[in-house]
């Protein structure tokens, strides 16, 4: 043994007050419970079940709100097959496509408005309507007054984007040049919306 090493003190005998009395365990279980340190992640057995129940209830409420949100979103996006319910992924994809279509519609509307303001396009009210023979409706006399074009579907879904300039169901707006008709017929650009 080295002379520099300190001798270890002998442990005190049980029941004898000594210098290490703070390390002794208390005899009372209440004191023992109070003196324990809680480990991170350790769950008290009594409150664990209640905490889990509260967490589960919060999660159920969260899922319910998410499902209600998807249900509301499904009502606002157009979808082809109304016979089946869209999945959440299909609903989100449809919403993204719908928002992009609305953005294009707004951009094109702004372009038409700017063209009208700049005098590039003549408003439809300035064009004289061709006279229809007696007994025929005015829409049959003018090719631009056709109520709908074959092969150009538009969504009849509520809330679907529609142009006020579209000739699908807006009646006769006057004789437009083919370039003006194409510019004003947004339904062909939106791919079925």
From Swiss-Prot:
SUPFAM superfamilies xref list: HLH, helix-loop-helix DNA-binding domain
Tissue: Expressed in placenta.
Keywords, alphabetical: Developmental protein, Differentiation, DNA-binding, Neurogenesis, Nucleus
One Pfam family cited in the UniProt record for this chain: HLH
Domain of life: Eukaryota
Ranges where the record places region Disordered: 1-58, 128-177
Signal peptide stretch: none
GO cellular component: cytoplasm; RNA polymerase II transcription regulator complex
Gene3D superfamilies: Helix-loop-helix DNA-binding domain
Gene Ontology biological-process annotations: chorionic trophoblast cell development; in utero embryonic development; negative regulation of T-helper 1 cell differentiation; negative regulation of T-helper 17 cell differentiation; negative regulation of T-helper 2 cell differentiation; neuron differentiation; placenta development; positive regulation of T cell migration
Biological role stated in the UniProt entry: Transcription factor. Binds to E-box motifs 5'-CANNTG-3' in the regulatory elements of target genes, probably as a heterodimer with another basic helix-loop-helix (bHLH) protein such as the transcription factor TCF3. May bind both open and closed chromatin, acting as a pioneer transcription factor to allow other factors to bind and activate lineage-specific genes. Required during post-implantation development for the generation of some differentiated trophoblast cell types.
Protein name: Achaete-scute homolog 2
Organism field: Bos taurus (Bovine)
Gene behind the chain: ASCL2
